[in-house]
Amino acid sequence: MRVKGPSSRRKKKKILKLAKGYRGQRSRSYRRAKEAVMRALYYQYRDRKLRKREFRRLWIARINAAVRAYGLNYSTFINGLKKAGIELDRKILADMAVRDPQAFEQVVNKVKEALQVQ
């Protein structure tokens, strides 16, 4: 007779613990819980990668909207930043555009100067 020992029980308890809070069979039945947990872990892994892309897209959209008020577009602005030697990343620039418009305006003016010199 085959003995289903502690390791098997431990494995099942671990899966059911991860499935706690799921609805219906997904939180009670080991087989259903295992499927749900595997899918959830896959989504978790995938979305950690996607989150970075989505935030970058959001920052770019905010910067683009902010610089258009000053007669520039995003790509020209980023080019001007490089020429002016300003090393602020997109996250900081987007935050500055939303929370500190005066400082952002100064950055835009520096960029415009750098673009006109060259």
Curated annotation (Swiss-Prot):
Its job: Binds directly to 23S ribosomal RNA and is necessary for the in vitro assembly process of the 50S ribosomal subunit. It is not involved in the protein synthesizing functions of that subunit.
Matches recorded under Pfam families: Ribosomal_L20
Taxonomic superkingdom: Bacteria
Database matches in PANTHER family: 39S RIBOSOMAL PROTEIN L20
Identification of the protein by name: Large ribosomal subunit protein bL20
GO molecular function: rRNA binding; structural constituent of ribosome
GO cellular component: cytosolic large ribosomal subunit
Organism this protein belongs to: Aquifex aeolicus (strain VF5)
Family designation: Belongs to the bacterial ribosomal protein bL20 family.
Keyword tags: Ribonucleoprotein, Ribosomal protein, RNA-binding, rRNA-binding
Protein encoded by which gene: rplT
Alphabetized HAMAP family for the sequence: Ribosomal_bL20 (MF_00382)
Stored Gene3D superfamilies: 6.10.160.10, Ribosomal protein L20
A biological process term (GO) from this entry: translation
